[in-house]
């Protein structure tokens, strides 16, 4: 299970969920690859430090321990994140019809997203190839329920989501150009009818 967390001072729900999930990472029993961006490294704020203390962990929550496979992401190269079967993908906000590279990067690498964000994501992708969460507590609980068989059971839906994600991974200018050309062609057909 992989995860990339950055620290922004923006007070958006998704940023707060990412920080909370990062702080609670030691509750995940399955192997993890948690990283912090070198551009915006995770720093503990007072709320996070208090949450960590309440969990009674003995170590400094920000210790960069090899035992936890927790490092600054080398050269901010995301490829390492998607060598895992599952990736925690938390959008900055939860809005209908909005999803970002946080989801697409996982789908295009056939990595199952443990996803929070777009409420109607099922309109775009097969949610049977995703793990949908509502809170950081869900993240921890569902990460602990993942077994070696989970990925294989989801494989047909992972493959379907990969095919769908390829369309969104294409450059926007290409998609816009094709849509304009399609509309022009449709308009010409109507005029010639």
What does each model-found stretch correspond to?
Residues 1-129, 161-188:
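Nucleotide-sugar donor-binding catalytic core of glycosyltransferases
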Residues 78, 139, 158:
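Catalytic phosphate/metal-binding cores of nucleic-acid and nucleotide-processing enzymes, i.e., regions
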Residues 103, 136-139, 151:
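Residues at or immediately preceding the N-termini of alpha-helices
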Residues 124-125, 140-146:
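Short, charged, surface-exposed secondary-structure boundary motifs
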Residues 131-136, 148:
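Conserved acidic donor-binding segment of nucleotide-sugar-dependent glycosyltransferases
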Residues 144-161:
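Conserved donor-nucleotide binding/catalytic region of nucleotide-linked donor-dependent transferases
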């Amino acid at each position: 299970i992989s995860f990339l967390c950055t620290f922004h001072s923006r007070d958006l729900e998704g940023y707060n969920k990412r920080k909370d999930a990062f702080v609670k990472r030691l509750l995940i029993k399955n192997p993890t690859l948690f990283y912090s961006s070198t551009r915006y490294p995770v720093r503990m704020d007072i709320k996070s430090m208090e949450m960590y203390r309440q969990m009674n962990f003995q170590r400094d929550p920000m210790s960069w321990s090899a035992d936890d496979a927790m490092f600054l992401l080398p050269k901010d190269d995301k490829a390492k994140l998607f060598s895992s079967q599952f990736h925690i993908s938390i959008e900055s906000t939860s809005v209908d019809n909005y999803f970002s590279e946080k989801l697409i990067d996982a789908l295009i690498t056939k990595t199952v997203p443990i996803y929070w964000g777009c409420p109607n994501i099922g309109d775009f992708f097969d949610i049977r190839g995703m793990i949908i969460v509502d809170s950081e507590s869900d993240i921890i609980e569902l990460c602990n329920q993942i077994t070696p068989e989970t990925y294989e059971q989801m494989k047909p839906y992972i493959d379907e989501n990969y095919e769908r994600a390829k369309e969104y991974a294409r450059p926007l200018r290409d998609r816009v150009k094709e849509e304009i050309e399609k509309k022009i062609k449709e308009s010409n057909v109507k005029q010639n009818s």
